[in-house]
Protein backbone atom coordinates (compact mmCIF):
# COMPACT_ATOMS: atom_id res chain seq x y z
CA UNK A 1 0.00 0.00 0.00
CA UNK A 2 2.89 2.32 0.60
CA UNK A 3 3.98 2.27 -3.02
CA UNK A 4 0.42 2.89 -4.21
CA UNK A 5 -0.03 5.92 -1.97
CA UNK A 6 3.33 7.41 -2.96
CA UNK A 7 2.88 7.15 -6.75
CA UNK A 8 1.33 10.63 -7.11
CA UNK A 9 1.21 13.26 -4.40
CA UNK A 10 0.41 16.91 -4.09
CA UNK A 11 0.21 18.73 -7.39
CA UNK A 12 0.63 15.52 -9.37
CA UNK A 13 -2.46 14.03 -7.74
CA UNK A 14 -4.41 17.21 -8.51
CA UNK A 15 -3.21 17.06 -12.11
CA UNK A 16 -4.42 13.45 -12.38
CA UNK A 17 -7.93 14.43 -11.30
CA UNK A 18 -8.13 17.01 -14.10
CA UNK A 19 -7.55 14.46 -16.89
CA UNK A 20 -10.68 12.99 -18.49
CA UNK A 21 -11.08 9.30 -19.22
CA UNK A 22 -12.48 9.98 -22.71
CA UNK A 23 -12.38 13.02 -25.00
CA UNK A 24 -15.34 15.21 -24.15
CA UNK A 25 -16.48 12.90 -21.36
CA UNK A 26 -17.52 13.84 -17.84
CA UNK A 27 -15.63 11.19 -15.87
CA UNK A 28 -12.09 11.94 -14.73
CA UNK A 29 -9.21 9.97 -13.26
CA UNK A 30 -9.14 9.25 -9.52
CA UNK A 31 -6.66 7.61 -7.15
CA UNK A 32 -8.67 4.40 -7.38
CA UNK A 33 -7.47 4.03 -10.97
CA UNK A 34 -3.84 3.99 -9.75
CA UNK A 35 -4.70 1.35 -7.14
CA UNK A 36 -6.35 -0.75 -9.86
CA UNK A 37 -3.29 -0.39 -12.14
CA UNK A 38 -0.96 -1.46 -9.31
CA UNK A 39 -3.03 -4.62 -8.78
CA UNK A 40 -2.90 -5.47 -12.49
CA UNK A 41 0.92 -5.09 -12.64
CA UNK A 42 1.34 -8.12 -10.39
CA UNK A 43 -0.13 -10.35 -13.11
CA UNK A 44 2.66 -9.39 -15.50
CA UNK A 45 5.46 -9.81 -12.95
CA UNK A 46 6.07 -6.05 -12.70
CA UNK A 47 6.70 -4.20 -9.44
CA UNK A 48 4.33 -1.52 -8.21
CA UNK A 49 7.26 0.81 -7.52
CA UNK A 50 7.78 1.30 -11.27
CA UNK A 51 4.79 3.66 -11.29
CA UNK A 52 6.61 6.14 -9.03
CA UNK A 53 8.96 7.46 -11.75
CA UNK A 54 8.99 8.33 -15.40
CA UNK A 55 11.64 5.73 -16.23
CA UNK A 56 9.68 3.00 -14.44
CA UNK A 57 6.51 3.85 -16.39
CA UNK A 58 8.53 3.71 -19.61
CA UNK A 59 9.72 0.20 -18.77
CA UNK A 60 6.12 -0.86 -18.15
CA UNK A 61 5.07 0.59 -21.51
CA UNK A 62 7.91 -1.27 -23.24
CA UNK A 63 6.64 -4.56 -21.81
CA UNK A 64 2.93 -3.94 -22.46
CA UNK A 65 3.19 -2.41 -25.93
CA UNK A 66 3.76 -5.66 -27.90
CA UNK A 67 0.72 -7.25 -26.22
CA UNK A 68 -1.73 -4.38 -26.85
CA UNK A 69 -2.79 -5.40 -30.42
CA UNK A 70 -4.05 -8.82 -29.30
CA UNK A 71 -4.63 -8.03 -25.64
CA UNK A 72 -7.85 -7.87 -23.65
CA UNK A 73 -9.74 -4.75 -22.63
CA UNK A 74 -8.12 -4.81 -19.17
CA UNK A 75 -4.67 -4.85 -20.76
CA UNK A 76 -5.53 -1.87 -22.97
CA UNK A 77 -6.95 0.03 -19.99
CA UNK A 78 -3.77 -0.67 -18.02
CA UNK A 79 -1.65 0.59 -20.92
CA UNK A 80 -3.74 3.79 -21.13
CA UNK A 81 -3.49 4.42 -17.38
CA UNK A 82 0.31 4.02 -17.42
CA UNK A 83 0.49 6.47 -20.35
CA UNK A 84 -1.37 9.07 -18.27
CA UNK A 85 0.92 8.51 -15.26
CA UNK A 86 4.00 8.80 -17.52
CA UNK A 87 2.76 12.17 -18.85
CA UNK A 88 2.21 13.45 -15.30
CA UNK A 89 5.77 12.45 -14.30
CA UNK A 90 7.11 14.06 -17.51
CA UNK A 91 5.09 17.23 -16.75
CA UNK A 92 3.27 17.00 -20.06
CA UNK A 93 -0.05 18.86 -20.19
CA UNK A 94 -2.79 16.50 -21.35
CA UNK A 95 -6.59 16.75 -21.26
CA UNK A 96 -7.64 13.15 -21.78
CA UNK A 97 -6.35 9.61 -22.32
CA UNK A 98 -6.05 9.93 -26.11
CA UNK A 99 -3.78 12.96 -25.75
CA UNK A 100 -1.54 11.06 -23.34
CA UNK A 101 -1.26 8.12 -25.75
CA UNK A 102 -0.26 10.40 -28.63
CA UNK A 103 2.49 12.03 -26.55
CA UNK A 104 3.83 8.62 -25.50
CA UNK A 105 3.91 7.44 -29.13
CA UNK A 106 5.85 10.49 -30.27
CA UNK A 107 8.34 10.03 -27.43
CA UNK A 108 8.90 6.35 -28.24
CA UNK A 109 9.42 7.12 -31.95
CA UNK A 110 11.90 9.89 -31.12
CA UNK A 111 13.93 7.62 -28.84
CA UNK A 112 14.03 4.46 -30.98
CA UNK A 113 13.84 6.07 -34.44
CA UNK A 114 11.34 3.41 -35.62
CA UNK A 115 7.70 2.68 -35.16
CA UNK A 116 8.25 -0.72 -33.62
CA UNK A 117 7.28 0.47 -30.14
CA UNK A 118 4.09 2.12 -31.35
CA UNK A 119 0.74 0.51 -30.59
CA UNK A 120 -0.96 -1.27 -33.43
CA UNK A 121 -3.73 1.32 -33.58
CA UNK A 122 -1.27 3.86 -34.98
CA UNK A 123 0.50 1.54 -37.43
CA UNK A 124 -0.46 1.87 -41.10
CA UNK A 125 -2.22 -1.15 -42.56
CA UNK A 126 -0.01 -1.14 -45.64
CA UNK A 127 3.09 0.80 -46.63
CA UNK A 128 2.73 3.37 -49.35
CA UNK A 129 3.74 2.39 -52.86
CA UNK A 130 3.53 3.79 -56.34
CA UNK A 131 0.77 1.45 -57.54
CA UNK A 132 -0.66 0.64 -54.12
CA UNK A 133 -2.62 -2.49 -53.40
CA UNK A 134 -5.77 -3.64 -51.74
CA UNK A 135 -5.62 -5.52 -48.50
CA UNK A 136 -4.58 -8.36 -48.03
CA UNK A 137 -2.28 -8.27 -51.11
CA UNK A 138 0.24 -5.45 -50.67
CA UNK A 139 2.99 -4.14 -52.90
CA UNK A 140 6.12 -4.05 -50.74
CA UNK A 141 9.64 -3.59 -52.12
CA UNK A 142 8.56 -4.06 -55.73
CA UNK A 143 6.89 -7.42 -55.03
CA UNK A 144 3.34 -8.36 -54.18
CA UNK A 145 3.10 -9.89 -50.73
CA UNK A 146 0.14 -11.74 -49.27
CA UNK A 147 -0.93 -10.96 -45.71
CA UNK A 148 -3.56 -13.27 -44.19
CA UNK A 149 -6.87 -11.90 -43.00
CA UNK A 150 -6.89 -10.59 -39.45
CA UNK A 151 -8.96 -12.39 -36.81
CA UNK A 152 -11.04 -9.23 -36.46
CA UNK A 153 -12.19 -9.45 -40.09
CA UNK A 154 -13.09 -13.12 -39.75
CA UNK A 155 -14.92 -12.45 -36.49
CA UNK A 156 -16.91 -9.65 -38.11
CA UNK A 157 -17.97 -11.98 -40.93
CA UNK A 158 -19.06 -14.74 -38.55
CA UNK A 159 -21.06 -12.29 -36.41
CA UNK A 160 -22.73 -10.91 -39.52
CA UNK A 161 -23.91 -14.37 -40.57
CA UNK A 162 -25.04 -15.35 -37.05
CA UNK A 163 -26.94 -12.13 -36.35
CA UNK A 164 -28.57 -11.55 -39.74
CA UNK A 165 -29.08 -15.25 -40.53
CA UNK A 166 -28.60 -14.74 -44.25
CA UNK A 167 -30.75 -11.68 -44.47
CA UNK A 168 -30.48 -9.15 -47.25
CA UNK A 169 -27.59 -7.46 -45.40
CA UNK A 170 -25.26 -10.46 -45.79
CA UNK A 171 -24.51 -9.83 -49.48
CA UNK A 172 -23.22 -6.24 -49.15
CA UNK A 173 -21.46 -7.22 -45.92
CA UNK A 174 -19.57 -9.96 -47.75
CA UNK A 175 -18.65 -7.55 -50.55
CA UNK A 176 -17.18 -5.08 -48.06
CA UNK A 177 -15.22 -7.64 -46.02
CA UNK A 178 -13.84 -9.54 -49.04
CA UNK A 179 -12.61 -6.50 -50.96
CA UNK A 180 -9.22 -7.30 -52.55
CA UNK A 181 -9.13 -10.85 -51.16
CA UNK A 182 -7.73 -13.85 -52.97
CA UNK A 183 -9.68 -17.12 -53.34
CA UNK A 184 -7.58 -18.46 -50.48
CA UNK A 185 -8.82 -15.69 -48.16
CA UNK A 186 -12.43 -16.10 -49.29
CA UNK A 187 -12.31 -19.83 -48.53
CA UNK A 188 -11.07 -18.95 -45.06
CA UNK A 189 -14.15 -16.78 -44.54
CA UNK A 190 -16.48 -19.55 -45.69
CA UNK A 191 -14.77 -22.15 -43.51
CA UNK A 192 -15.27 -19.99 -40.41
CA UNK A 193 -19.06 -20.34 -40.64
CA UNK A 194 -19.98 -23.19 -38.31
CA UNK A 195 -23.77 -23.16 -38.50
CA UNK A 196 -26.01 -22.87 -41.55
CA UNK A 197 -24.31 -25.74 -43.36
CA UNK A 198 -27.32 -26.08 -45.66
CA UNK A 199 -26.62 -22.60 -46.97
CA UNK A 200 -22.92 -23.43 -47.30
CA UNK A 201 -23.81 -26.50 -49.38
CA UNK A 202 -25.94 -24.34 -51.69
CA UNK A 203 -22.98 -21.99 -52.16
CA UNK A 204 -20.68 -24.96 -52.97
CA UNK A 205 -23.11 -26.20 -55.62
CA UNK A 206 -23.25 -22.75 -57.21
CA UNK A 207 -19.43 -22.62 -57.22
CA UNK A 208 -19.22 -26.00 -58.97
CA UNK A 209 -21.76 -24.91 -61.60
CA UNK A 210 -19.97 -21.64 -62.29
CA UNK A 211 -16.57 -23.40 -62.42
CA UNK A 212 -17.86 -25.90 -64.97
CA UNK A 213 -19.28 -23.07 -67.09
CA UNK A 214 -15.91 -21.27 -66.87
CA UNK A 215 -14.08 -24.34 -68.18
CA UNK A 216 -16.50 -24.55 -71.11
CA UNK A 217 -16.07 -20.89 -72.02
CA UNK A 218 -12.27 -20.88 -71.52
CA UNK A 219 -10.76 -24.09 -72.97
CA UNK A 220 -7.07 -24.94 -72.58
CA UNK A 221 -5.13 -23.42 -75.53
CA UNK A 222 -2.61 -26.23 -75.70
CA UNK A 223 0.77 -27.23 -74.29
CA UNK A 224 2.66 -24.34 -72.73
CA UNK A 225 6.42 -23.77 -72.84
CA UNK A 226 8.41 -24.50 -69.73
CA UNK A 227 8.36 -21.79 -67.09
CA UNK A 228 5.27 -20.04 -68.43
CA UNK A 229 2.30 -19.44 -66.10
CA UNK A 230 -0.70 -21.56 -67.02
CA UNK A 231 -4.18 -20.16 -67.46
CA UNK A 232 -6.55 -20.58 -64.49
CA UNK A 233 -9.22 -23.26 -64.61
CA UNK A 234 -12.51 -23.22 -62.71
CA UNK A 235 -11.01 -25.20 -59.84
CA UNK A 236 -8.05 -22.78 -59.77
CA UNK A 237 -10.41 -19.82 -59.36
CA UNK A 238 -12.18 -21.67 -56.53
CA UNK A 239 -8.81 -22.09 -54.81
CA UNK A 240 -8.83 -25.89 -54.69
CA UNK A 241 -6.05 -26.59 -57.24
CA UNK A 242 -4.03 -23.36 -57.03
CA UNK A 243 -1.64 -21.82 -54.53
CA UNK A 244 -1.67 -18.30 -53.12
CA UNK A 245 1.39 -17.37 -55.23
CA UNK A 246 -0.32 -18.47 -58.43
CA UNK A 247 -3.46 -16.55 -57.52
CA UNK A 248 -1.42 -13.37 -56.93
CA UNK A 249 0.41 -13.83 -60.24
CA UNK A 250 -2.87 -14.23 -62.15
CA UNK A 251 -4.28 -11.12 -60.48
CA UNK A 252 -1.27 -8.81 -60.96
CA UNK A 253 0.61 -10.05 -64.04
CA UNK A 254 1.29 -7.29 -66.58
CA UNK A 255 -0.27 -9.07 -69.58
CA UNK A 256 -3.83 -10.38 -69.56
CA UNK A 257 -4.39 -10.34 -65.80
CA UNK A 258 -7.22 -12.54 -64.54
CA UNK A 259 -8.92 -11.17 -61.40
CA UNK A 260 -9.54 -14.58 -59.89
CA UNK A 261 -10.47 -13.00 -56.55
CA UNK A 262 -13.25 -10.85 -58.01
CA UNK A 263 -14.53 -13.72 -60.17
CA UNK A 264 -14.71 -16.01 -57.15
CA UNK A 265 -16.50 -13.26 -55.19
CA UNK A 266 -19.18 -13.00 -57.90
CA UNK A 267 -19.80 -16.74 -57.75
CA UNK A 268 -20.25 -16.62 -54.00
CA UNK A 269 -22.52 -13.59 -54.27
CA UNK A 270 -24.82 -15.59 -56.55
CA UNK A 271 -24.92 -18.35 -53.95
CA UNK A 272 -25.55 -15.88 -51.12
CA UNK A 273 -28.44 -14.33 -53.04
CA UNK A 274 -30.06 -17.74 -53.38
CA UNK A 275 -29.56 -18.32 -49.66
CA UNK A 276 -31.19 -14.97 -48.94
CA UNK A 277 -34.25 -15.96 -50.97
CA UNK A 278 -34.35 -19.32 -49.19
CA UNK A 279 -34.09 -17.84 -45.68
CA UNK A 280 -36.48 -14.97 -46.52
CA UNK A 281 -39.35 -16.60 -48.43
CA UNK A 282 -41.62 -13.55 -48.07
CA UNK A 283 -42.58 -12.22 -51.48
CA UNK A 284 -42.66 -8.48 -51.98
CA UNK A 285 -46.25 -8.82 -53.21
CA UNK A 286 -47.19 -10.05 -49.72
CA UNK A 287 -45.74 -7.00 -47.95
CA UNK A 288 -48.82 -5.03 -46.88
CA UNK A 289 -49.30 -2.36 -44.28
CA UNK A 290 -51.26 -3.32 -41.20
CA UNK A 291 -54.29 -1.30 -40.06
CA UNK A 292 -52.41 0.15 -37.08
CA UNK A 293 -48.85 -0.02 -38.49
CA UNK A 294 -46.99 3.29 -38.99
CA UNK A 295 -46.18 4.08 -42.60
CA UNK A 296 -42.44 4.35 -41.87
CA UNK A 297 -42.31 0.80 -40.49
CA UNK A 298 -44.19 -0.45 -43.54
CA UNK A 299 -41.71 1.30 -45.88
CA UNK A 300 -38.77 -0.28 -44.00
CA UNK A 301 -40.24 -3.77 -44.45
CA UNK A 302 -41.04 -3.06 -48.09
CA UNK A 303 -37.52 -1.95 -49.01
CA UNK A 304 -35.95 -4.77 -47.01
CA UNK A 305 -37.93 -7.28 -49.07
CA UNK A 306 -37.16 -5.33 -52.25
CA UNK A 307 -33.47 -5.52 -51.41
CA UNK A 308 -33.68 -9.32 -51.36
CA UNK A 309 -35.35 -9.38 -54.79
CA UNK A 310 -32.81 -10.14 -57.53
CA UNK A 311 -34.54 -8.42 -60.43
CA UNK A 312 -33.85 -5.72 -62.97
CA UNK A 313 -33.58 -2.13 -61.61
CA UNK A 314 -36.47 -1.08 -63.89
CA UNK A 315 -38.69 -3.72 -62.30
CA UNK A 316 -37.67 -2.55 -58.83
CA UNK A 317 -38.52 1.02 -59.80
CA UNK A 318 -41.98 -0.09 -60.96
CA UNK A 319 -42.52 -2.01 -57.72
CA UNK A 320 -41.60 1.08 -55.73
CA UNK A 321 -43.99 3.36 -57.59
CA UNK A 322 -46.92 0.93 -57.76
CA UNK A 323 -46.83 -1.62 -54.95
CA UNK A 324 -45.77 0.81 -52.24
CA UNK A 325 -49.02 2.78 -52.64
CA UNK A 326 -51.19 -0.17 -53.59
CA UNK A 327 -50.38 -2.24 -50.49
CA UNK A 328 -50.76 0.62 -48.00
CA UNK A 329 -53.70 0.64 -45.59
CA UNK A 330 -56.83 2.66 -46.52
CA UNK A 331 -55.87 5.64 -44.34
CA UNK A 332 -52.40 6.06 -45.86
CA UNK A 333 -53.63 5.19 -49.35
CA UNK A 334 -56.12 8.06 -49.17
CA UNK A 335 -53.33 10.45 -48.22
CA UNK A 336 -50.91 9.14 -50.86
CA UNK A 337 -53.43 9.45 -53.68
CA UNK A 338 -53.84 13.11 -52.82
CA UNK A 339 -50.12 13.75 -53.52
CA UNK A 340 -50.56 13.39 -57.26
CA UNK A 341 -48.55 11.32 -59.73
CA UNK A 342 -45.13 9.89 -58.82
CA UNK A 343 -44.50 11.53 -55.43
CA UNK A 344 -41.06 11.17 -53.87
CA UNK A 345 -40.44 8.94 -50.88
CA UNK A 346 -39.72 11.97 -48.72
CA UNK A 347 -43.10 13.49 -49.61
CA UNK A 348 -44.86 10.21 -48.82
CA UNK A 349 -43.16 9.83 -45.45
CA UNK A 350 -43.93 13.44 -44.55
CA UNK A 351 -47.57 13.21 -45.60
CA UNK A 352 -48.22 9.92 -43.79
CA UNK A 353 -46.42 10.92 -40.61
CA UNK A 354 -48.75 10.09 -37.73
CA UNK A 355 -51.36 8.35 -39.92
CA UNK A 356 -52.35 5.06 -38.35
CA UNK A 357 -50.69 5.90 -35.04
CA UNK A 358 -52.34 6.44 -31.65
CA UNK A 359 -52.57 10.19 -32.17
CA UNK A 360 -54.54 9.91 -35.38
CA UNK A 361 -56.81 7.21 -33.92
CA UNK A 362 -57.50 9.45 -30.94
CA UNK A 363 -58.45 12.34 -33.22
CA UNK A 364 -60.82 10.14 -35.24
CA UNK A 365 -62.39 8.82 -32.03
CA UNK A 366 -62.85 12.35 -30.70
CA UNK A 367 -64.55 13.46 -33.92
CA UNK A 368 -66.86 10.44 -33.87
CA UNK A 369 -67.83 11.04 -30.25
CA UNK A 370 -68.42 14.71 -31.01
CA UNK A 371 -70.88 13.81 -33.74
CA UNK A 372 -72.70 11.30 -31.51
CA UNK A 373 -72.84 13.36 -28.32
CA UNK A 374 -73.48 16.74 -29.97
CA UNK A 375 -77.07 17.94 -30.45
CA UNK A 376 -78.81 16.90 -33.62
CA UNK A 377 -79.26 19.66 -36.18
CA UNK A 378 -82.71 21.22 -36.04
CA UNK A 379 -84.53 21.58 -39.36
CA UNK A 380 -85.14 25.12 -40.51
CA UNK A 381 -88.93 24.77 -40.45
CA UNK A 382 -88.88 23.36 -36.90
CA UNK A 383 -86.55 26.13 -35.78
CA UNK A 384 -88.96 28.71 -37.16
CA UNK A 385 -91.94 27.12 -35.38
CA UNK A 386 -90.20 26.85 -32.01
CA UNK A 387 -91.54 29.48 -29.61
CA UNK A 388 -89.26 31.56 -27.48
CA UNK A 389 -89.26 31.25 -23.70
CA UNK A 390 -91.39 33.78 -21.88
CA UNK A 391 -90.62 34.75 -18.31
CA UNK A 392 -93.62 34.64 -15.92
CA UNK A 393 -91.90 37.05 -13.57
CA UNK A 394 -91.20 40.01 -15.87
CA UNK A 395 -93.19 39.02 -18.97
CA UNK A 396 -90.20 39.25 -21.34
CA UNK A 397 -89.09 36.60 -23.83
CA UNK A 398 -85.70 34.96 -24.06
CA UNK A 399 -85.34 33.51 -20.57
CA UNK A 400 -87.25 31.60 -17.93
CA UNK A 401 -88.43 32.78 -14.53
CA UNK A 402 -85.60 30.87 -12.85
CA UNK A 403 -83.04 32.89 -14.84
CA UNK A 404 -84.83 36.23 -14.42
CA UNK A 405 -82.84 39.01 -12.76
CA UNK A 406 -85.85 41.22 -11.99
CA UNK A 407 -87.27 41.36 -8.42
CA UNK A 408 -89.41 38.42 -7.50
CA UNK A 409 -93.06 38.98 -8.32
CA UNK A 410 -95.37 38.65 -5.30
CA UNK A 411 -98.80 37.05 -5.34
CA UNK A 412 -100.49 35.03 -8.02
CA UNK A 413 -98.80 35.07 -11.38
CA UNK A 414 -102.18 34.82 -13.16
CA UNK A 415 -104.37 37.42 -11.49
CA UNK A 416 -101.76 39.37 -9.53
CA UNK A 417 -103.66 39.17 -6.23
CA UNK A 418 -101.85 38.15 -3.03
CA UNK A 419 -102.87 35.32 -0.76
CA UNK A 420 -102.69 32.43 -3.18
CA UNK A 421 -100.58 30.98 -5.96
CA UNK A 422 -101.41 30.39 -9.58
CA UNK A 423 -102.26 26.75 -8.96
CA UNK A 424 -105.11 27.77 -6.61
CA UNK A 425 -106.13 30.90 -8.50
CA UNK A 426 -109.95 31.33 -8.45
CA UNK A 427 -109.86 32.90 -11.88
CA UNK A 428 -108.83 29.66 -13.46
CA UNK A 429 -111.57 27.93 -15.42
CA UNK A 430 -112.63 24.43 -14.46
CA UNK A 431 -115.15 21.84 -15.54
CA UNK A 432 -117.94 20.38 -13.50
CA UNK A 433 -115.41 18.13 -11.73
CA UNK A 434 -113.38 21.08 -10.47
CA UNK A 435 -109.70 21.77 -10.93
CA UNK A 436 -107.90 18.49 -11.26
CA UNK A 437 -104.35 17.73 -10.21
CA UNK A 438 -103.24 17.56 -13.81
CA UNK A 439 -103.15 21.33 -14.13
CA UNK A 440 -105.20 21.47 -17.33
CA UNK A 441 -108.79 22.15 -18.20
CA UNK A 442 -111.07 19.09 -18.34
CA UNK A 443 -112.13 17.99 -21.73
CA UNK A 444 -115.58 16.77 -20.75
CA UNK A 445 -117.47 19.68 -22.34
CA UNK A 446 -116.44 22.33 -24.78
CA UNK A 447 -116.23 25.81 -23.32
CA UNK A 448 -117.78 28.50 -25.45
CA UNK A 449 -115.53 31.48 -25.92
CA UNK A 450 -117.59 34.69 -25.86
CA UNK A 451 -115.82 37.71 -27.34
CA UNK A 452 -115.39 40.65 -25.03
CA UNK A 453 -117.93 43.47 -25.44
CA UNK A 454 -120.55 41.21 -26.97
CA UNK A 455 -123.52 39.84 -25.02
CA UNK A 456 -125.58 37.21 -26.74
CA UNK A 457 -129.31 38.11 -26.87
CA UNK A 458 -130.60 34.70 -27.75
CA UNK A 459 -130.42 31.79 -25.34
CA UNK A 460 -127.68 29.25 -26.02
CA UNK A 461 -128.63 26.64 -28.46
CA UNK A 462 -127.15 23.86 -26.34
CA UNK A 463 -128.74 23.54 -22.85
CA UNK A 464 -125.53 21.99 -21.55
CA UNK A 465 -123.84 25.41 -21.60
CA UNK A 466 -126.22 26.77 -18.95
CA UNK A 467 -125.76 23.66 -16.85
CA UNK A 468 -121.96 23.96 -17.14
CA UNK A 469 -122.05 27.56 -15.88
CA UNK A 470 -123.98 26.45 -12.81
CA UNK A 471 -121.43 23.72 -12.13
CA UNK A 472 -118.64 26.26 -12.41
CA UNK A 473 -120.27 28.56 -9.87
CA UNK A 474 -120.84 25.68 -7.49
CA UNK A 475 -117.21 24.61 -7.85
CA UNK A 476 -116.09 28.15 -7.13
CA UNK A 477 -118.09 28.20 -3.91
CA UNK A 478 -116.60 24.87 -2.86
CA UNK A 479 -113.08 26.16 -3.42
CA UNK A 480 -113.78 29.22 -1.33
CA UNK A 481 -115.05 27.01 1.48
CA UNK A 482 -111.92 24.84 1.33
CA UNK A 483 -109.64 27.86 1.36
CA UNK A 484 -111.31 29.53 4.35
CA UNK A 485 -112.44 26.75 6.73
CA UNK A 486 -111.44 28.71 9.82
CA UNK A 487 -113.83 31.54 8.92
CA UNK A 488 -116.81 29.19 8.64
CA UNK A 489 -116.05 27.49 11.97
CA UNK A 490 -115.90 30.82 13.74
CA UNK A 491 -119.21 31.87 12.15
CA UNK A 492 -120.88 28.64 13.37
CA UNK A 493 -119.62 29.25 16.92
CA UNK A 494 -121.03 32.78 16.88
CA UNK A 495 -124.43 31.50 15.77
CA UNK A 496 -124.46 28.90 18.57
CA UNK A 497 -123.55 31.48 21.24
CA UNK A 498 -126.40 33.69 20.07
CA UNK A 499 -128.79 30.76 20.20
CA UNK A 500 -129.18 30.60 16.47
CA UNK A 501 -128.93 27.64 14.18
CA UNK A 502 -125.92 27.73 11.85
CA UNK A 503 -126.88 28.39 8.28
CA UNK A 504 -126.26 25.61 5.80
CA UNK A 505 -127.06 25.79 2.17
CA UNK A 506 -129.35 23.01 1.10
CA UNK A 507 -128.05 20.71 -1.58
CA UNK A 508 -128.71 22.28 -4.88
CA UNK A 509 -130.64 20.72 -7.63
CA UNK A 510 -127.53 20.64 -9.73
CA UNK A 511 -125.71 18.29 -7.33
CA UNK A 512 -128.77 16.10 -7.16
CA UNK A 513 -128.78 15.87 -10.89
CA UNK A 514 -125.08 14.86 -10.67
CA UNK A 515 -126.13 11.51 -9.20
CA UNK A 516 -128.25 10.82 -12.18
CA UNK A 517 -125.23 11.07 -14.44
CA UNK A 518 -123.55 8.03 -12.93
CA UNK A 519 -126.58 5.86 -12.20
CA UNK A 520 -126.44 3.59 -9.17
CA UNK A 521 -122.67 4.04 -8.63
CA UNK A 522 -123.15 7.09 -6.38
UniProtKB/Swiss-Prot annotation:
Residues 219-226 are annotated as: PPIA/CYPA-binding loop. A lipid is attached at residue 2 (N-myristoyl glycine). The modification Phosphoserine is found at residue 150. GO terms for cellular component: host cell nucleus; host cell plasma membrane; host multivesicular body; membrane; viral nucleocapsid; virion membrane. Residues 111-136, 473-522 are annotated as: Disordered. A motif (PTAP/PSAP motif) lies at residues 456-459. SMART domains: ZnF_C2HC. One of its GO terms (molecular function) is zinc ion binding. Residues 14-33 are annotated as: Interaction with membrane phosphatidylinositol 4,5-bisphosphate and RNA. It comes from Human immunodeficiency virus type 2 subtype A (isolate ROD). Residues 8-43 are annotated as: Interaction with host CALM1. Coiled coil: none annotated. InterPro entries: Gag_p24_C, Lentvrl_matrix_N, Matrix_HIV/RSV_N, Primate_lentivir_Gag_pol-like, Retrov_capsid_C, Retrov_capsid_N, Retrovr_matrix, Znf_CCHC. Disulfide bonds: none annotated. This is Gag polyprotein. Residues 191-228 are annotated as: Interaction with host PPIA/CYPA and NUP153. The keyword Disulfide bond does not apply. Residues 73-77 are annotated as: Interaction with membrane phosphatidylinositol 4,5-bisphosphate. GO terms for biological process: viral budding via host ESCRT complex; viral translational frameshifting.
Amino acid sequence: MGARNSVLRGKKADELERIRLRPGGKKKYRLKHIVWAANKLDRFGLAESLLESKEGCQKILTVLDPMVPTGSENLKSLFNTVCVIWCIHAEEKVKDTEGAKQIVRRHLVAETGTAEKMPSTSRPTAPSSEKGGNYPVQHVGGNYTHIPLSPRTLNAWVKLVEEKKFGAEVVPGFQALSEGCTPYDINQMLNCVGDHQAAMQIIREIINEEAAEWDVQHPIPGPLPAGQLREPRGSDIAGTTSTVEEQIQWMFRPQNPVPVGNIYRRWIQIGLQKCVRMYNPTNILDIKQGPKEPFQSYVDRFYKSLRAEQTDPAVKNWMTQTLLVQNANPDCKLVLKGLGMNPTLEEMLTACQGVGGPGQKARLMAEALKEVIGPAPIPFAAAQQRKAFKCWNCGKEGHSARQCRAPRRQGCWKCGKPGHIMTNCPDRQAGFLGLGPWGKKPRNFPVAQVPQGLTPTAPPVDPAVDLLEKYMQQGKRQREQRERPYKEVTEDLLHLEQGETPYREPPTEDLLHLNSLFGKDQ
